[in-house]
Amino acid sequence: MHESIKIHIGRCQMFLLVNIIGLFIFLGIGVIFSRNRKNIQWKSIFILVILNLFLAWFFIYFPWGRAGVKGAANGIAWVIESAHEGTGFAFKSFTSNKMMDMAVSALFPILLVVPLFDILMYFNILPKIIGGIGWVLAKVTRQPKFESFFGVEMMFLGNTEALAVSSEQLKRMNEMRVLTIAMMSMSSVSGAIVGAYVQMIPGELVLTAIPLNIINAIIVSCILNPVSIEEQEDVVYSIKDHQTERQPFFSFLGDSVLAAGKLVLIIIAFVISFVALADLIDRLIHLITHLIANGIGVKGSFGLDQILGVFMYPFALLLGLPFNEAWEVAQQMAKKIVTNEFVVMGEISNQVNAMTPHHRAVISTFLVSFANFSTIGMIIGTLKGIVDKKTSDFVSKYVPMMLLSLIHI
């Protein structure tokens, strides 16, 4: 018994050591590909890393932190129950079965959550929350005010929505700061989509992952694209002076519901299309490798997950996972980058509770963001409609760096 305890402690210490080494390697990769290594503000990076580690400890191990996250997750679940009531009123058969389809259980609640967030925006409640958290984050991390505010905006609004809301600010910023914002946008998550996430993986993991990913995004952008600004440039421009006349509430609410409906249809279309395309490519690769294997007298084949998993495997190992779990996570990470988070969440939703705590935390943190190939197109497209051609072309030139930030996130 004592021997087994010693072996378990030894393994934990080894994986913790690998985790620490992995942190330095990830930071090192960022430094190698940095646009301006001399300008990296290591004091801010150190503060951000410590803050991230503290939040991870607080939310996962500290009783008050765990209780807070659990309470918030239960609150979201309570709101989702109202969403299911709305779905059940229109489609009773959809919600009568405990095993609801993914679209019904995860995506239909968006029809409630998006208008709910928009109502909070309409009455200026959400902007005040964003401003307060952003101000604290800017003071603690010593980052420019807008970059900190934008990190919090992403946590509630999502990438394209946060960019659209911040359009006046982006028009006044230099191209290097806009690139920083584009890189940060790779790690965004929309508060309106959180309701969908918590239907597929435990809510406490989702809510823990969101702030960690936002801080990770700031760390990555500070290393890959360090920018120094003068004090007079560190200004957050108000959008109130540029707003059109305020819509009547029910007209605004109607537009919000329509936007939510379009969002649900878009996500369903993306999920169906990406799953189908990924499966087709996987089948073709299996067929080709099977024919090659038969030609050389070997049995077996491999597919898309295995190919992409090989590339992601070293990164998964550096996260302190055992070899077998690292291989599984590597394939899931690769599939999420190529398709989207909903595809992988749907696959692991029935397995996540059986995973080891560290395995569960790693995969949940990676999945809870919009970071994938299609996100790059969305960000570039949104920026083209906001900033001038010179700035959008500058950002487009650094797509490889955005891809690198995607892997770091």
Spans of features found by a protein language model:
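Short, membrane-interfacial amphipathic segments enriched in basic
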Residues: 65, 82, 124-126, 239-255, ...
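Conserved small/polar residues in nucleotide/adenosyl-binding loops
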Residues: 407-409
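Hydrophobic alpha-helical hairpins/lids featuring a short glycine-rich hinge
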Residues: 84, 88-143
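Long, contiguous bundles of hydrophobic transmembrane helices that form the permeation core
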Residues: 214-263
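Hydrophobic transmembrane alpha-helices of multi-pass small-molecule transporters
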Residues: 1-3, 8-68, 243-272, 283-284
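Hydrophobic core segments of alpha-helical transmembrane domains in multi-pass membrane transport
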Residues: 22-33, 48-60, 108-119, 188-196, ...
